[in-house]
Amino acid sequence: MIDPNLLRNNLEEVAEKLKVKRNFVLDVALLSELEEQRKSLQVKTESLQAERNARSKNIGQAKARGEDISALLNEVEHMGIELSTTKAHLDEVLAEINQIVLAIPNLPADEVPLGKDESENLEVFRWGTPKTFDFDVKDHVSLGEGLKGLDFAAGVKLSGSRFVVMKGQIAKLHRALSQFMLDLHTEQHGYTETYVPYLVNHATLYGTGQLPKFGEDLFHTNALEGEQPYALIPTAEVPVTNLVRDEILDEADLPLKMTAHTPCFRSEAGSYGRDTRGLIRMHQFDKVELVQIVAPETSMQVLEELTGQAEKVLQLLELPYRKVLLCTGDMGFGSCKTYDLEVWLPAQNTYREISSCSNMWDFQARRMQARCRSKTDKKTRLVHTLNGSGLAVGRTLVAILENYQNADGTITVPSVLRPYMGGLAQIG
């Protein structure tokens, strides 16, 4: 969430920025009214507490003098009832304010280009040259089915649309990709491999910003009465980032760099009719995630570093891609600055997103109460959190099938993956 002090001290300015940069309309009148109620109730609560404490002290003194204290006891009792009622009202107002604040997106960094949607994103550069084929290229679905490695019909039978069964050498290639990515990030980029639960509680989802706004995008468990509800993770960012929730970290230990390979589960609400063919938009897909927890003054520099580490995967796989700086209208809810990496897909004759790398500033840290402290300063401050795909495994598989296809329908295995494939140079 954004800093409540910004809302209290610069509400009109923040509201205007949200409207212009995020197309988000903040109800200024309602929030102002609730803030006035909060301040009034806060003052009344503190006044009642102070008065009750003073009266309680008087009771002790009167009792010591042997005086009748029944009237004083009655006053304190009634004051306690009024205090409880006022506190309850204050809690209600605070909860209402909190619900509003939790729905407010992060403010973009100043350097983020203003724009309404993805058409106004800014291309930073391109890497690699798309291959020219001397035959009609096939898409990954035709290639995978021809090699009997992608079985979408089985996915439908077992689960429904947007699921797949992988088999044989294609399944092995899919596994090889995740192993290659993890090895690269742990051995060369300094990340600690992390294994996390795939089911998380609601506090975890609030921490990284999936709840309350994006509940419909999640797959939720049907909790029995009295049991804690869970949801399947939409990305490893959720459990990995929440490892620092309610923690005070030593600044000397920062940055914390963690990577995890997990399946990701998304309902794809609002995506009806989009990318219905193939692996591009699935309910279940694998991803290798990069997460960094850093000191605030380093986060913009770290965003460049983290994005470069995701780029390295594409470069070693020799897959042409482009780097795009997202405009304000296309950024994620909690991000202050995001780069997308888009890989070239020959069958679509276009670049498609394969990684999104974001600096969340202190947006998630404030929700999680994740703080750090230096040895020279006893005061704590919020950390900054960053995350990025390093990479989406299924989409990387798509890119390899299409970019490394041969005229006879076989697939050349990229050289960096051959050690993970038992030396296999060609599929099919």
Curated annotation (Swiss-Prot):
Keywords: Aminoacyl-tRNA synthetase, ATP-binding, Cytoplasm, Ligase, Nucleotide-binding, Protein biosynthesis. One of its GO terms (cellular component) is cytoplasm. It is an enzyme of class 6 (ligase). ATP binds at R266, S267, E268, E353, I354, S355, S356. One of its GO terms (biological process) is selenocysteine biosynthetic process. It comes from the Bacteria. It holds the Pfam family tRNA-synt_2b. L-serine binds at T235, A236, E237, E289, S389. GO terms for molecular function: ATP binding; serine-tRNA ligase activity. It is found in: Cytoplasm. Homodimer. The tRNA molecule binds across the dimer. PANTHER family: SERINE--TRNA LIGASE (PTHR43697:SF1), SERYL-TRNA SYNTHETASE (PTHR43697). Belongs to the class-II aminoacyl-tRNA synthetase family. Type-1 seryl-tRNA synthetase subfamily. Consists of two distinct domains, a catalytic core and a N-terminal extension that is involved in tRNA binding. Catalyzes the attachment of serine to tRNA(Ser). Is also able to aminoacylate tRNA(Sec) with serine, to form the misacylated tRNA L-seryl-tRNA(Sec), which will be further converted into selenocysteinyl-tRNA(Sec). This is Serine--tRNA ligase.
